[in-house]
Amino acid sequence: TYAALAHPSTIAHLKKIGVTSVELLPIHQLISEPHLIKMGLYNYWGYNTINYFAPHHRYASLQAQSDGPQAIMDELKTAIRELHRAGIEVILDVVYNHTAEGGARGLTYSYRGLDSSNYYRQDDAGNYHDTTGCGNSLNFGNSHVVDLVIDSLRYWTNEMQIDGYRFDLATTLARDESNTFDPGHPLLRRIVEDESLSSAKMIAEPWDVGLGGWQ
């Protein structure tokens, strides 16, 4: 749980073994894939995001879950604050390359219901371009999608006090309108130039499953 992450015994152990930063697997609100749910299983890895601003409720203590969204947020903030007090940075693994809604036959949970044609990369016939292997890819040729990610990063940096990010399948985040990787992509430039983000630690997973994916 978030509370356990900042428990004195946890922090004491991290300090004892010389840890100066922790990287958390994705903690954005997520759902399990339908085929896992049918088997009674759960996506423990977390790479199936439906919202980039809310922390996943199931990682909070039962008490916080019972008390509601603000209690979950406060529990996570407390954990980050206590780690910082111990001199330990907090880095988040973030999954901005796709959402949990899957391919064309997937369910509608979030951004697909808001505006599928703008949020997801598609061809002229409306078929999804999938460079993530997860059924869909967010359309970073659309400035609104770039704004979404920048706003999310600012929120987690300024409000939640996160120190850095590891970008899952980062090549997808810098594909232009022709689906080609662009090292000068607007998202990359805005991260570097942003007052809130320019000093954060940034780690990129340098590939996706599209053409020219390894970067």
What would you call each of these model-derived segments?
Residues 88, 197-200:
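A short helix->loop->beta-strand "cap" motif at the edges of active sites that frequently abuts
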Residues 2-161, 166-193:
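Substrate-binding/active-site clefts of carbohydrate-active enzymes
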Residues 188-192, 199-215:
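Polar, glycine-rich mid-to-C-terminal structural blocks
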